[in-house]
């Protein structure tokens, strides 16, 4: 701020001087906007990948998150820990795949029955109920169920790659190429799977998923 004194009128005038000149502000603004847009894009991508975890069986993801630090010894693996971690990932991955073929049925009394979709209809696990043939056929196995099962398996793989304990267990000293792959691959899988699930949403409400209103 500059203060000018008008000697003839005896009036003190204040003139405001901008802290940054227009030239510097116009030169810096595009970089700021560009960085902000990039940060938003990256944040949205990671948020999309995180939201995909909601498409996985809740119990499977919870079990993996609880057992991962134990099996990996918080990322400091020996041969036994590495074997246990591989076994944990395999079991949870298979669980995500196979549970994609489960569905639920709520009867008039409000009781929920879980079962597997088959090529003939719906097989209730505990045999507590028997659905009419026409209703059972509406639950039968379809090709899209296999697509959803594969996508669930891939999404779980992305969740595993975001787990630093597992990554440190199998890659304690990763090369630059491996670090780049471990960073970009889960994001790519998340974007691809989100597009598939958005285009072909699942209608199943199986074990570990929200209940069906049917």
From Swiss-Prot:
Pfam families from the UniProt entry: DUF679 (PF05078)
Family annotation (InterPro entries): DMP (IPR007770)
GO biological process terms on file: endomembrane system organization
TM region positions: 52-72, 83-103, 143-163, 178-198
Highest taxon, organism lineage: Eukaryota
Cellular localisation: Vacuole membrane
UniProt main location, coarse: membrane
UniProt keyword annotation of Transmembrane helix present: yes
Tissue-wise expression: Expressed constitutively in leaves, stems, flowers, siliques and roots (e.g. root hairs).
Annotated membrane topology: Multi-pass membrane protein
Coiled-coil ranges from the UniProt annotation: none
GO CC annotations, alphabetized: plant-type vacuole membrane
Keyword Transcription: no
Keywords associated with the record: Membrane, Transmembrane, Transmembrane helix, Vacuole
Its job: Involved in membrane remodeling.
Entry's family note: Belongs to the plant DMP1 protein family.
Name of the protein in question: Protein DMP6
Organism: Arabidopsis thaliana
């Amino acid at each position: 701020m500059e203060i000018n004194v008008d000697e003839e009128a005896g009036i003190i005038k204040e003139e405001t001087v901008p802290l940054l000149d227009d030239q510097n502000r116009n030169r810096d603004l595009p970089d700021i906007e560009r960085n902000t847009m990039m940060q938003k894009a990256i944040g949205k991508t990671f948020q999309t990948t995180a939201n995909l975890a909601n498409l996985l069986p809740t119990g499977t993801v919870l079990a993996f998150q609880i057992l991962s630090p134990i099996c990996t010894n918080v990322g400091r693996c020996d041969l036994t820990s590495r074997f246990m971690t591989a076994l944990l990932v395999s079991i949870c991955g298979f669980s995500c795949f196979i549970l994609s073929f489960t569905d639920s049925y709520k009867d008039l009394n409000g009781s929920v029955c879980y079962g597997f979709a088959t090529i003939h209809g719906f097989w209730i696990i505990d045999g507590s109920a028997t659905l009419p043939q026409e209703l059972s056929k509406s639950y039968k196995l379809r090709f899209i169920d296999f697509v959803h099962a594969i996508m669930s398996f891939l999404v779980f793989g992305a969740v595993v790659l975001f787990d630093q304990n597992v990554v440190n267990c199998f890659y304690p000293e990763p090369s630059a190429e491996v670090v780049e792959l471990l960073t970009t691959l889960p994001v790519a899988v998340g974007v691809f799977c989100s597009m598939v699930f958005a285009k072909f949403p699942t209608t199943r409400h199986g074990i570990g998923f929200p209940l069906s209103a049917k």
